[in-house]
Amino acid sequence: LLCNKPLINYTIEEALKSKYLDKIILSTDDKKIAQITNKFGITVPFMRPKKLAKDNSPMLPVIKHLLNKLEKDYSYDPEIIILLQPTSPLRTVKHINEAIKKFLKSKSDSLVSVTKLPHNMNPYSIMKLERNGNLKKFLKYDEKKNLRQLKPIFYARNGAAIYITTKKTIFKKNSFFGDTILPYFMSKIDSIDIDDQLDWIFAETIIKNLKNLWKIK
């Protein structure tokens, strides 16, 4: 439990607040998680196949399987797909709505939430370990110049907390991304993606502090 609440609840509660989501569907192989979501009225039309529920299973085949089965067995054929992964507990309905509105106003065929990379993770700071044991700069640059000032800003997917794409893009490109990818910028704090125990501790600390701030207000 993250601050006495199942991790998935954070995503469900915020998704339910959005006026833009016509239907919320959960893909899982865990009956306990399915029971939790049923209490919220979230649809779990079928359990995810075991072959698509391994720790290293990529998300794209899961979504393609879900869409194919929804169309074949339930005659449900959505045009726009919004993927909200449960490992982003600080992603709120505000983020969801803003991302959807940005996507709908654009001519892009995909959107992904991103956060700015810190100085030490910028590609110009990264070094590659060669087979001979030596380090090599990942990108070349003029060391006579102030690198901090010259570095271009790079962004990375934050989990990603939000993916928006079309069914057409998923099956035509075999990817969540089409030819035009729109960014939705999120802060470092809101971008926390729980992948290990340290991420969990960070998220728990931030949530507890936010609660204290709300109490003060």
Regions found by a protein language model. Give the residues of each.
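N-terminal glycine-rich phosphate-binding loop and ensuing alpha1 helix
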Residues: L1-S27
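Active-site-adjacent beta-strand anchor residues
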Residues: L26-S27, S113, Y163, D193
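A structural signal for isolated positions on well-ordered beta-strands in alpha/beta enzyme cores
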Residues: K23-I25, L111, L182
